[in-house]
UniProtKB/Swiss-Prot annotation:
Residues modified as N6-(pyridoxal phosphate)lysine: K194
Full protein name: 2-aminoethylphosphonate--pyruvate transaminase
Keyword Transferase: yes
Organism: Salmonella gallinarum (strain 287/91 / NCTC 13346)
GO process terms (BP): organic phosphonate catabolic process
GO-annotated molecular function: 2-aminoethylphosphonate-pyruvate transaminase activity
Length: 367
């Protein structure tokens, strides 16, 4: 265990503010109205309002990581006669395919490759050829590569074909402006420890109430029953079915205040975008190349090719950066040797400048 605090250049968990951390110093009783009505219900309302101004949506909080909520949605939203088209171009789309397989959910996996943008015409053709498909699921910000996927165009298709639309917006919600009603999204999934800049411990689903109501009795899991979790919160003023991660929830409530103070999602998006552009420009000046073309990048995380120098080892590069107080991500692309640097969380222009200086110092293979 180290007492040193690092700047996390990762897509979550990420570097949080001191005040978000301090919010966890308070102990809450999960039965108290002060907590359930005063904190949980306020969070649910704020999340829904952040997602859309349209009526008919609600928020459900669920213990666990983002993947728990993805599995809860897939396992609750699809009935035994339903079939989901899963658009996959990275590890997190592939994880949805794996979940569907394990739960015995009928699915069509459209895998367009890790460095390719999903082809909307191909998706159109799949939907046209297979009328048994009832749902579409895809990742918005695919952090495997840093790709930002076309949820708007796919949402238009979902609406035209009358399909239920599920979007994993784990690493984009709160950091990229969106109106989920305008995007025809029925279920949006995200997590406390991403763009809203809270800490790990729970995920959340923002969904059409009409769609949620139809999930009754469908869940393939007791703990991950999205309908039951929603009804418990609705009927008991924010109470969770099972033990609430109280400290994480308090941290998240503080993080929401800080998001508003920053100027909301639009202002945070601008900061993330500037961070990412400065990072890419600086890395290219140091001789690194990006995995994706610029027009495909999200403002969340960027994948860089590893240097071709035979002396280069990611583990040594990582160690030298960590010694200087910076933590980056290893690559997750199966076909390319790369590493990833995130720029969300409490990360500002001065931090990117300091990181680039540290990277220059850590480039031992150029000495």
């Amino acid at each position: 265990m180290t007492s040193r605090n690092y700047l996390l250049l990762t897509p979550g968990p990420l570097t949080t503010s001191r005040t978000v951390k301090e919010a966890m110093l308070f102990d809450s009783c999960t039965w108290d109205d002060d907590y359930n009505i005063g904190v949980v219900e306020q969070i649910r309302q704020q999340l829904t309002e952040m997602a859309t101004a349209s009526e008919g949506y609600t928020s459900v909080l669920l213990q666990g990581s983002g993947s728990y909520a993805v599995e809860a949605v897939l396992g609750s939203a699809l009935g035994p006669q339903d079939k989901v088209l899963i658009v996959s171009n990275g590890a997190y789309g592939a994880r949805m395919v794996e979940m569907a397989g394990l739960m015995g959910i009928a699915h069509h996996a459209y895998d367009c490759g890790e460095v390719a943008r999903p082809d909307v015409q191909a998706i159109d053709a799949i939907l046209n050829a297979d009328p048994t498909i009832s749902h579409i699921a895809m990742v918005h910000s695919e952090t495997t590569t840093g790709m930002l996927n076309p949820i708007d165009e796919v949402g238009t298709l979902a609406h035209r074909y009358g399909k239920t639309y599920i979007v994993d917006a784990m690493s984009s919600f709160g950091g990229i402006p969106m109106d989920i009603a305008a995007l025809h999204i029925d279920y949006l999934i995200s997590s406390a420890n991403k763009c809203i800049q809270g800490v790990p411990g729970f995920a959340f689903v923002i969904a059409r109430e009409q769609k949620l109501a139809a999930c009754k009795g469908r869940s393939r899991s007791l703990s991950l029953d999205l309908y039951a979790q929603w009804r418990c919160m609705e009927d008991n003023h924010g109470k969770w079915r099972f033990t609430s991660p109280t400290h994480t929830v308090l941290a998240f409530a503080q993080a929401l205040k800080e998001l508003a103070k920053e100027g909301g999602v639009a202002a945070r998006h601008q900061r993330y975008q500037q961070n990412q552009r400065s990072l890419v420009a600086g890395m290219r000046a140091l001789g690194f190349n990006t995995l994706l073309d610029d027009e495909l990048h999200s403002p969340i995380i960027t994948a860089f090719y590893s240097p071709e120098d035979p002396q280069y080892r990611f583990s040594e590069f990582y160690r030298r950066l960590k010694e200087q107080g910076f933590v980056i991500y290893p690559g997750k692309v199966s076909q390319s040797d790369c590493f990833r640097i995130g720029n969300i969380g409490e990360v500002y222009a001065a931090d990117i400048t300091a990181l680039l200086t540290a990277i220059r110092t850590a480039m031992y293979w150029t000495k």
